[in-house]
Amino acid sequence: MGYCQDDQLVNKICDLYEKISKLETLKPCEDVDTLFKQLVSTCIPPNPNIDVTKMSENIQEMRSNLIKICGEAEGYLEHHFSSILTSFEDNPLHHLNLFPYYNNYLKLSKLEFDLLEQNLNGFVPRTVAFIGSGPLPLTSVVLASSHLKDSIFHNFDIDPSANMVAARLVSSDPDLSQRMFFHTVDIMDVTESLKGFDVVFLAALVGMDKKEKVKVVEHLEKHMSPGALLMLRSAHGPRAFLYPIVEPCDLEGFEVLSVYHPTDEVINSIVISRKLGEDANGVVHDHIDQASDLACNCSKIHVIMNKKKSIIEEFAGANEEQLT
């Protein structure tokens, strides 16, 4: 195999990677579903002792390949279920529970909204961007329908087929069809429009490796308005075999407000940060402690447990018109 080290968990992940790599297709079918369920169940138990960034180059290469495979399979799965949902004659959004991971999205979106609310100080965002929304934009749908009921959502995806099926998904809904818009574009080509968003969500699989992720973050830092919030998804422990890791030091030009590591079936960690600089009202958003070089060393981060027994890492520190 060449990838694995003497660790039972990592060996199991390596074994599943080998099997998944040999699949004839990553589109939903019995073999694909079985192997990916095994992979998720293997990676999901919290294990803070697992640090993928310190593993061998062979393991790092396997992980990088596995994340790309997971991203491709996730895209096929979302396309599959979005097509099923849009086949209903009534409102497709009434049948979202058919998607096998819908409850996970409900929990993740609630966690993200709670963190967002804690850092908005009573302000309700008028405009929200979701970058990498995909064919089944569940985060946008759940946030718009359950939490941010007056906000306008702009979904960006580079894949025209993803946007086409996603737009059909909300077209029958009398509310979301008026508040949710889809843009087929590479986010690296979007500049001035980014200044019009109060909150920007970056999907976990936009930028599948460290270099790509940092490049996207640098672009957002250049064009987002000071004071706007950036919500990112990361991964912790063995879950980092499924999704890329975002570390505080990757967010130059932003103040990291919170990092949240769920310990239940919600896979993604949540990172919330604020764009630094002087906003249109003359308010300067800067690090309260001026510690601009926040370390990536987790031992320097104060870790506490919240009431839900999930890990939260609290860091020091406390309009363009509607797009068409």
From Swiss-Prot:
Signal peptide: none annotated. It catalyses: 3 S-adenosyl-L-methionine = nicotianamine + 3 S-methyl-5'-thioadenosine + 3 H(+). Keywords: S-adenosyl-L-methionine, Transferase. One of its GO terms (molecular function) is nicotianamine synthase activity. Synthesizes nicotianamine, a polyamine which serves as a sensor for the physiological iron status within the plant, and/or might be involved in the transport of iron. Belongs to the nicotianamine synthase (NAS)-like family. This is Probable nicotianamine synthase 4.
